[in-house]
Amino acid sequence: MRPYLDLLRDILDHGCPKGDRTGTGTLSVFGRMMRFDLSRGLPLVTTKKLHLPSIIHELLWFVSGSTNVRDLQRHGVTIWDEWADDNGELGPVYGRQWRNWNGAIDQLAGLVEQLRRNPGSRRLLVSAWNPSDLDAMALPPCHYAFQCHVADGRLSLMFQMRSADVFLGLPFNIAGYALLTHMLAQQTGYEPGELIWCGGDVHLYLNHLEQARLQLTREPYPPPTLKLARKPGSLFDYRYEDFVVEDYQAHPHIKAAVAV
């Protein structure tokens, strides 16, 4: 995860002070990219411990189409609680857009079908940015779209973020989309290729600066590996226990407040 550490350093060295919706304040840069070769391991940050169950359950929650945090809470995952209403609802966020766009289109099912039938297509896209639904969302999508690409028997995925909380959120996003790439590749008969991240407003909150500096003092460990324990019948049939992450060695967790 050297690219991630380089990004932290880039923001600390070149970021511009900027106000934000939460009132916390940020150091921000604009327009950045990172690439990860998934054949070399799973891109999990090792300079602080990540809570892997939250990453896996969040991805499965997105894929299921759910928008209610109670479906996460039953697995002990609380990362979305701050934005939910009294009934646990978040409005038409990621799961709704991926699985039921405008009440009619299952984008994920369509993507899998196209990967099987027309893998050379340049339209292998899924979007969560639905302008007609934005006002009803508890939080508009930060990672708003992803695109797949197939070449030389490998499936690669690029995802775009309009806003990237680099210390807290981005490590989860990178890991989650890496898992999704493995799932899509397995379901469609390819090897996992590259994971590519593109960020718009890429920032560190001002109350995360010391934590970022601490992370930069730590030497990263080799990346862990991912094995999928079985091949489910469809993209929508994966379970938590299907994801076997081996040799994840990491430095201790670093506590930081979420900007709501």
Curated annotation (Swiss-Prot):
A GO cellular component annotation in the UniProt record: cytosol
Under Gene Ontology molecular function, one entry of this record is: thymidylate synthase activity
Q: Which CDD domains match?
A: TS_Pyrimidine_HMase
What does the UniProt keyword field contain? Answer: Cytoplasm, Methyltransferase, Nucleotide biosynthesis, Transferase
Q: Which InterPro entries match?
A: Thymidate_synth/dCMP_Mease (IPR045097), Thymidate_synth/dCMP_Mease_dom (IPR023451), Thymidate_synth/dCMP_Mease_sf (IPR036926), Thymidylate_synthase (IPR000398)
Subcellular compartments: Cytoplasm
Methyltransferase among the record's keywords? yes
Functional description taken from the UniProt entry = Catalyzes the reductive methylation of 2'-deoxyuridine-5'-monophosphate (dUMP) to 2'-deoxythymidine-5'-monophosphate (dTMP) while utilizing 5,10-methylenetetrahydrofolate (mTHF) as the methyl donor and reductant in the reaction, yielding dihydrofolate (DHF) as a by-product. This enzymatic reaction provides an intracellular de novo source of dTMP, an essential precursor for DNA biosynthesis.
The record's HAMAP family line, in alphabetical order, gives:
Thymidy_synth_bact (MF_00008)
Under the heading NCBIfam families, the entry gives: PRK01827.1-3 (NF002497), thym_sym (TIGR03284)
* The name this protein goes by in its record: Thymidylate synthase
Give the source lineage, highest ranks first: Bacteria, Pseudomonadati, Pseudomonadota, Gammaproteobacteria, Methylococcales
